[in-house]
Amino acid sequence: MEIAICLLTTEPNHLEEWLDHHINKGFKDFIIFRDRFDFLYGEKYQNVNIIDEYIETPNEVRFQMDLYLKVCKKHKYDYILFIDSDEYLELSEEYSSIQDFIEKFKEKHSNFDGIGINWRMYGNNDIIKTRNSVDSYIKYYRDDHIKTLVDPSKVKIFMDPHLPILNNKSHILNEKGEKITTPIKTHSSNSIWIKHLWTRSLEEWKIKVQRRGWYQFYDRKMEQFYEYNNKCIDI
């Protein structure tokens, strides 16, 4: 089974940690688009396949969705996961890798072409200014938005970066085997989830507030940092 993970990112400081995390989850193929920054891949990545491209993105909201569709048309993988640099795939302890999860999912659900994976939104652990490692973030709240692991050959178009529209008779399921038709699905994250480091530090939130273009669908405000953090609890 060939599974890739696709990333469009503006954030060089996240990339090494993001790569290491997903290699640990079983990913061996990466499709990475670096928006206006250089990155030197070290020798530790010589055993994984990284398709890497430097790009300068236009100031257009649709750019990300159009890029995702091009990736689906160009690359022949069984599945591709489309996530961002502040998002990290997580699995419960019963699964050794993403491959293991999909194989066991197939034993329960035979008719699917993608899996919608809910967000867990993590706050900054009350350490406002310091950016910590991924594993140190433990407080979160459940969010109904999803990101998608999908068979690229079945994708018709992306109208939203969270969920593609598939060809006729193709289906995306959540972890419980329920069909997903919108980018928001009642939260379920017992076996698989996206660890979304939404308010990782105050400094990084300031950058999110200032962003415009493909990565910004709506205006953010500084006070939202504290609003989101206050929703995060130990679960």
Model-derived features: positions:
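Catalytic-site signature of metal-activated, phosphate-bearing donor transferases
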Residues: 61-69, 91-235
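N-proximal low-complexity "stem/linker" segments adjacent to membrane-targeting elements
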Residues: 1-23
